[in-house]
Amino acid sequence: EGKNGQPPTNWRSYFGGSVWEKVPGYENKFYLHSFAKEQPDLNWENEVVREKIYEMICWWMDQGLAGFRIDAIMNIKKDLTWSDLEPDGPDGLADVYKVTGKVKGIGDFLLEMKHRCFEPYNALTVGEAMFVKEEILPQFIGDQGYFSTIFAFEPCHAYRKGKNYMDYDWPQPFDDWKKETFHNQKIIEKAGFEANIIENHDQPRGASLFIPEEDYGFYSLSALAMIMLCQRGLPFLYQGQEIGMSNRRWEYAE
């Protein structure tokens, strides 16, 4: 339910604007979308919904899949008090990640999914779980963790200056990336191993982010690849990375 026709809370979606969209045909009913309005969040508090999700996962496992990359999984649990947050921008909204992921109870969902869907198939699972604190890493990865491993996002986020995808230093200061990489490698040692990345679909090409344009070439790209491959963990390559693909700016009309 909304507040006199207004959204229930002042939460901002990852793509900007309110996380709330009016349900067609209703004046004061809203649905929540952490990302695009075309992607309504599923209600994981509903046991029937969870059962259908598990049914679909197991169907795919029965087809012979070896595992899953589990995208945006830290958003499945919400703060059910539905409270407004202190605005963190001129739009009067606050980022939705502040009320997801860190909310008590998400582990219950993740453990249930592991026991029901992944353990019976000995599946490999790679969770997109950002900003997991050092003290709870063993809950997330390894033999007793929710996932086999999670992506090592922290080094790739060292370039961020603001809240948005485009708020970054480019090329990234090497010392910042080096510091985050060494720190991340150290804290993960006792918990298990991570999935190491240079880039993915949410971030700039590593060749452009880490290498100044005047230094772009075979040797600098080879060095970047070796830095990733020589880290402890499981290396993940994003399509195009194998040929050293760089960014390109496109002009387009609305």
Language-model-derived ranges and their functions:
Residues 1-254:
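Active-site and adjacent substrate-binding regions of carbohydrate-active enzymes
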